[in-house]
């Protein structure tokens, strides 16, 4: 018998990259998971159902429907994606989740934020999360905020356009030797599961998640060591990238060029000592030598 038997975690955005990883980890740890999605008949939703998740349709733009979806749940994991909802929609959805969690007497809300948690950066996807976090802190629900830095998956996953983004425009606009904080989505999921298991150690905390700090030049060298060749780079012009992906990432990279971000790995390692370094992660993934320059996706930082 699992210590979590009878306790349900509702995952908002369960079919996205983070949501899928968190759902899988929670199921593996013995939680019952209510996977909330706009498309319960979709491929990703069906895969989660096959693992044992209770997949349900939910609309994060509708607080009343969320409150019904949260009924009887112990905790909620909340992640939004501005590539789907837009910036205003992300704020609305994130606030709705917090309000619905409070209304449903949820015992623990874990919110997936990102970035340095400072206002005024001009980076839309960071500003939205600052707004959602501020709102969530002011409602009556126990809260943990997780702020992962760059996903390691940005280096390999086709939907993030790595040849054009991470391996070309990011170093071009930010600088190839600027330090970058990295963490894998699977390690974020492990930490989220730990937060639900030990709420006393996590409630009220705002955690920047970084398991390794490597510049793009260092990541290129590690890639070469792992695969025997450098990562593929596609010299896409900035204007072209912004045309199909928007200006969020290019604004972010320019901001990171000119501003300091605390990239201390120790807090993450204290919580999750097995969190992977870039070298360990690339080695485990057997990184492909030719990541796609293009592909079907929602942008370089889809969540």
Predicted regions and their residues:
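Short, conserved active-site loop motifs that form the nucleotide-linked donor/cofactor pocket
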Residues: 52-53, 143
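Juxtamembrane extracytoplasmic segments of single-/few-pass membrane proteins
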Residues: 265-271
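Hydrophobic "lid"/C-terminal helical patch
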Residues: 192, 196, 223, 253, ...
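Oxidoreductase cofactor-interface core, primarily capturing Rossmann-like NAD(P)-dependent enzymes
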Residues: 2-47, 61-64, 68-71, 81-92, ...
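Amphipathic terminal alpha-helices
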Residues: 271-303
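Terminal hydrophobic/aromatic helix or amphipathic segment near a protein terminus
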Residues: 207-208, 220-262, 295-303
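Cofactor-binding loops of NAD(P)H-dependent oxidoreductases
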Residues: 58
